[in-house]
Amino acid sequence: MSNVRHHEGSVTIEISNQLSEVLSVIERHSGINVAGRAFVRSAVDGGLKPYSDIDLLVTVAVKLDETTRRALLNDLMEASAFPGESETLRAIEVTLVVHDDIIPWRYPAKRELQFGEWQRNDILAGIFEPAMIDIDLAILLTKAREHSVALVGPAAEEFFDPVPEQDLFEALRETLKLWNSQPDWAGDERNVVLTLSRIWYSAITGKIAPKDVAADWAIKRLPAQYQPVLLEAKQAYLGQKEDHLASRADHLEEFIRFVKGEIIKSVGK
């Protein structure tokens, strides 16, 4: 599985070597029996942007023992880099699920393992996240079915059950609870702004869009006083300029509260 396929509309040469390494890392661990299913999202979901990470969803046949979990997370850390810190590596986000935990679909579903750069300091300190219920899998699997390339096996829309709209909306409602006051988004302002625009898009359309596409959609629907916040976040995401959202705390909070209110109108509290 470590040889990444190339075909029209699939994985770019730019990330193929890194993807091959990540898949090899997963295969190397004897406790992991990959069920022939791996999907990559960010590389095709609107194309790679300057600070885009690589989102990989892998289905395995069996649960991980603790030794395998620790070894895998340590090795994945070596195949990833924080955005902008490496000329050759992008940040990777790996979500690993056990086949029988998500097929047939049930909500909320369980994830076996997740790796991302935000975990680096914890992993270095010997703190390893266990398997857990993850409401976000409803969103992640919807994204995979709409915007992904299968590295091994059939397409995601053939492999995964559709996520019912009521489960998607429940996951969107729960996600909104993450952001209630300024400490909740401090240091992550741009991502929170862009994520809220995506949630708003999904709440209205029932579909998933790339961050910049959702931002364009949302800007057209925002009152004029809130548009500069989202425009600044979008331009920074595209590498066109740096954002200074952290210095605009009041405007940022007003934007977040407005968009959350619009989302709640669509999906309920």
Curated annotation (Swiss-Prot):
Entry protein name: Aminoglycoside (3'') (9) adenylyltransferase
Enzyme class, first EC level, given as a word: transferase
Substrates-to-products reaction catalysed: streptomycin + ATP = 3''-O-adenylylstreptomycin + diphosphate; spectinomycin + ATP = 9-O-adenylylspectinomycin + diphosphate
Role: Mediates bacterial resistance to the antibiotic spectinomycin and probably also to streptomycin.
One GO MF term attached to the UniProt entry: aminoglycoside 3''-adenylyltransferase activity
Organism classification: Bacteria, Pseudomonadati, Pseudomonadota, Alphaproteobacteria, Hyphomicrobiales
GO biological processes: response to antibiotic
Highest taxon above the source species: Bacteria
Pfam families: AadA_C
Stretches of the chain forming a coiled coil according to its record: none
Record key words, sorted: Antibiotic resistance, ATP-binding, Nucleotide-binding, Nucleotidyltransferase, Plasmid, Transferase
Observed phenotype of the null mutant: Loss of resistance to spectinomycin.
EC number: 2.7.7.47
The keyword Iron-sulfur appears for this protein: no
InterPro entries, per database record: AadA_C, NT_sf
Electron transport as UniProt keyword: no
Family annotation (NCBIfam families): ANT_3pp_I (NF012157), PRK13746.1 (NF010309)
